[in-house]
Amino acid sequence: MAQTLSFNGRRRVRKFFGKIPEVAEMPNLIEVQKASYDQFLMVEEPKGGRPDEGLQSVFKSVFPITDFSGASMLEFVSYEFEPPKFDVDECRQRDLTYAAPLKVTLRLIVFDIDEDTGAKSIKDIKEQSVYMGDMPLMTNNGTFIVNGTERVIVSQMHRSPGVFFDHDKGKSHSSGKLLFAARVIPYRGSWLDIEFDAKDIVYARIDRRRKIPVTSLLMALGMDGEEILSTFYTKSLYERSGDGWRIPFNAETLKGAKTVTDMIDADTGEVVVEGGKKLTPRLLRQLQDKGLKALKATDEDLYGLFLAEDIVNFQTGEIYLEAGDEIDEKTLPVILKAGFDEIPVLGIDHINVGAYIRNTLSADKNENRQDALFDIYRVMRPGEPPTMDSAEAMFNSLFFDAERYDLSAVGRVKMNMRLDLEVADTVRVLRKDDILAVVKMLVELRDGKGEIDDIDNLGNRRVRSVGELMENQYRLGLLRMERAIKERMSSIEIDTVMPQDLINAKPAAAAVREFFGSSQLSQFMDQVNPLSEITHKRRLSALGPGGLTRERAGFEVRDVHPTHYGRICPIETPEGPNIGLINSLATFARVNKYGFIESPYRRIIDGKVTTDVLYLSAMEEAKYYVAQANAELDAEGSFIEEFVVCRHAGEVMLAPRDNINLMDVSPKQLVSVAAALIPFLENDDANRALMGSNMQRQAVPLLRAEAPFVGTGMEPVVARDSGAAIGARRGGVVDQVDATRIVIRATEDLDPSKSGVDIYRLMKFQRSNQNTCVNQRPLVTVGDFVNKGDILADGPSTDLGDLALGRNVLVAFMPWNGYNYEDSILLSERIVADDVFTSIHIEEFEVMARDTKLGPEEITRDIPNVSEEALKNLDEAGIVYIGAEVQPGDILVGKITPKGESPMTPEEKLLRAIFGEKASDVRDTSMRMPPGTYGTVVEVRVFNRHGVEKDERAMAIEREEIERLAKDRDDEQAILDRNVYGRLIEMLRGQVALAGPKNFKKGTELSNAVVSEYPRSQWWMFAVEDEKVQGELEALRGQYDESKSHLEQRFMDKVEKVQRGDEMPPGVMKMVKVFVAVKRKIQPGDKMAGRHGNKGVVSRIVPVEDMPFLEDGTHVDIVLNPLGVPSRMNVGQILETHLGWACAGMGRQIGELIEAYKANGNIEPLRKTIDMVVGDGPKSDDVHNYDDASVLRLADQWKRGVSIATPVFDGAGEADVNEMLAMAGLKETGQSTLYDGRTGEQFDRQVTVGYIYMLKLNHLVDDKIHARSIGPYSLVTQQPLGGKAQFGGQRFGEMEVWALEAYGAAYTLQEMLTVKSDDVAGRTKVYEAIVRGDDTFEAGIPESFNVLVKEMRSLGLSVELENSKVDDLQAAGQLPDAAE
């Protein structure tokens, strides 16, 4: 069979161990950010206008704005964005914000108001487009650029609006009684709490203020006492018959009761149930079936019941008893005397129905609506006298005014679900019925019906993403603006103004700026490597404005909840105070329009698992039985086992296969991206997996990235979605490649209006937020065909489009002379020599020349008192050359600052007079390299203020930039020409020409030869007979001219931007930024880790020949302590080691077969081996059909080690590992004989040797080591500052003092506490003594002692230091002198 498939070698092929086919595509990993913000901005207006959400809804909710008199109104018409002034790269370089100007069209309507009738008529309408500030745009990678730095807006988890029922778990009251409470939480507005107290009275609180009886709230809603009782209780009529009463028989209320006396049928007089019997449901049913209607009761049986209606004398209107009054010995005779023989009674039995609302009503002091409203007014605004109008207005504004109160669509949906209402989700305020339903449900809970809510359920927590956070912020800004507009509309002559004059957009712009600049949720992007970027964008934080605080959050909120499954990762969360408050979205999860997290499931129809995928939120999932992704299926897609493990309502259970309605999509749907990158995650302890996920985010991009032998199949997804590796936007042919850009001639999606050329700019040695190096390298060569989505270039930490955070190294698990005690790591010198763990870090230094009071600072080479040697790296302008190697103390930018005039001595005056003034009045403030940093200058940027003359260096940089832009333009022009003229000649070929250039014969049939006789620019002169073709020619011409002018225009704009001066902070004339690349080799003290939470510090780097070696003489690269495995239970690292060993063994075999093929030209053995390795899993590449060149490319990729993927929870088992080892011809134990490199002796026991993937973390000893002799002191205590950033000292703390005390080292101790710390006079003396060469000094009083004395005085204690006494005693010889 002919092998036809071609493989270009530009992606990594892996052998897949996964057995479960994935039916759903993993959603784009940064979709959370992009979709949310796009929905908010809605830059392109859809057909039919923008829907009422995002920015549109903000404007709609604030406008129209009417002035106080109602004589004019400002309406919102529409908004649009202009293109941003600077693109993403320019913003990064110039420290600007990437934003687009927002233009809003407003309409001002002026009315004429008839003074007599008050009727309005429109007098004037003016419409105008108004600039409303800049709106930050999101880059393609889901970040924002604010003042030149990349930031991420983290999504926030908060409690969903709606109604929640809960109890205090018996904590409030000593009896341990459960006090139930309900809380209505709106999206914005006042909270309403309804709660029981220990006496079972129901109270309401508004905004957590003083409580009022709930009946007052109901009265304020317009109900009276009788109506309240009839709403909450049923009524039954007791009729007088003879000397007793006839009471209706109700089986429901009697359930479970015990009879005290005999039950007698009121109609027949027979005893139906004897006294002292329990009324079982069965017995009651029998009585009902017999036709029992009513029972006989005595007067005593009525005592303790409550009246349902007022008992009124209708003639006189006298009220004998009110509704809710209790019937007892005193009241019953009153009723009988008044001649009532029918009594309406409330259906309260104290068992199924409690008298809570009735008791509340009787305890409530307010009698009517007015009292209730006044009471509420006093609670909300204490100290103000209420009037009926103000009280009514205040009460209405609390819950029933859409301006002040908003449940939001989510809140309304949740409320409908919880209270079984059916209200449209456009009703965003509370209604009377809602409040009644809440109180009813609460009373039912107290009566033992229904369940309380679990607030940690993901159905009750929702996510606010960027768009929504931004919307709230912008709304605040507009509301601030609204007040100003109203005032201005009232104070200004409205007939003469335009909308522009009324609006000051500052508050809105300030709100946006404040949100991006200083909100807790707007964070500096974690940019150590591509994984940390993606994780940061998928983070969910419970902190932030309107969220929890670390201190308040209890254990429950932080804990893993069953609803997290497939929505929030149970593994990835920080260690420390934020644990459980900051989470990560699971791989397949997405956020729905209401902000709830959804997870995908496969539908099961008639017992067969379909590929139909359904996204469900936690609330919707509760009613289903969900099987796991690894449940065994037969060929038809039915479950093999009779009982299947499944999840239902938060429990894991075995259920019959017919009950199961859904199945998970993939085994990795429950973990986050970082956790899904850990192979053999299922064999690691959860705590270590957590460390593993967190440490992968800190892996520094290495000089040479290398993809792991043992991956999980998630690597390409992360590399692609993070934007580190560049994917092709559309298919085409590579036209040009160099280190800085790739030019592709498109062959698909050829839209006439768009350019037919895609230029991809590569980032070269840029600095990331964490000072790591961002560098992209092209993978394609000229002439390659690419398809949409193909990887064109590798970025930091990517290798052939796979995420590559570390390196594969040969590991041995064994002790080695104690150098791997306590998780230390022993390395071979080969690792340093071959730059295995070398990384590049880029430091940015900036210097500003300001205009000071004494004159301007100057950036110059002419610095006083500095030798020529120190200036050797500076150019004429005083700025360091690119490529200069710099070390601590070297000058990067020379700068001088004017010094204050000091009075001159006569000698100075004489010298001045003779030599003219110079050097004396300036001081050297040059920027120098900080201590401990060595590197190479890779880039210099010079920024000048408008109108400041540019120096030579700035001009040179500008020239280079313009040349680069011109080259881009010329290349694009060339490709455009080639493309267009190619199409033109295709169109002309075979046509009959009617006209042409000079000397052309009409009627000639055109061919390539004929056309080529003329220069290209004259080809447009040909006109052809065929009208259709002629039309196409003209269209092509128009399009070509338009593209050309567009290209030129773009070039001119960019040149203009380059030449224009820069925006500078006030007082700054010039700014220089110098970027220095620092090469960091691995060294003792650096922190390293594997992917399984196995972290350690490099303790020693040993010569290669001293490292243990294998029988074939290969030395291991790294030695780890075997004791790090058992107690930590992260066995995944051992399995990874074995599998890596097998991969390397297979790679060796493939390498030998390549050599054999080169010798004999027979490719079959190679093809067979590769075929055998890849196997035929559901995700395997079709290697079988590769052509010979492709097989060789793949073999070349695999000769160092075969790449495999073992997905989480669906990876290689023990049998697979053994099979791989056998295939590689290695021992199935995975252990080898090792020899000691120093003595050459064999070690007694076999040692586990293999390849493990190690990462170098961003905790490098070079950044941490620090020393100080003199430096800054704290202002108050006069002690040295702390920390490397402040150039501080080392803290000699309490315990260290004890140590010196224990040694009896009195003088050392005295020195530590005085002259080396805060004895101000003493330390100056010591300095002077050292300078003189003396070694005598005296310690004085530490400043902190004085601080203590002052603090005690501030407490009102008179503390005196009686120093004189000590001196006197010493003088009198009663105290010994200090020892010499």
Swiss-Prot record:
The answer, when asked if Transcription is one of the entry's keywords, is yes
Q: What are its GO biological-process terms?
A: DNA-templated transcription
- Pfam assignment, any one: RNA_pol_Rpb2_3
Which Gene Ontology MF annotations are present? DNA binding; DNA-directed RNA polymerase activity; ribonucleoside binding
Cite the entry's keywords alphabetically: DNA-directed RNA polymerase, Nucleotidyltransferase, Transcription, Transferase
E.C. numbers = 2.7.7.6
Q: Which reaction does it catalyse?
A: RNA(n) + a ribonucleoside 5'-triphosphate = RNA(n+1) + diphosphate
InterPro entries in UniProt: DNA-dir_RNA_pol_bsu_ext_1_sf, DNA-dir_RNA_pol_bsu_external_1, DNA-dir_RNA_pol_su2, DNA-dir_RNAP_su2_dom, DNA-dir_RNAP_su2_hyb_sf, RNA_pol_bsu_bac, RNA_pol_bsu_CS, RNA_pol_bsu_protrusion
PROSITE patterns reported for this sequence: RNA_POL_BETA
Give the similarity note: Belongs to the RNA polymerase beta chain family.
**Name of this protein:** DNA-directed RNA polymerase subunit beta
Its lineage reads: Bacteria, Pseudomonadati, Pseudomonadota, Alphaproteobacteria, Hyphomicrobiales
Give the gene symbol: rpoB
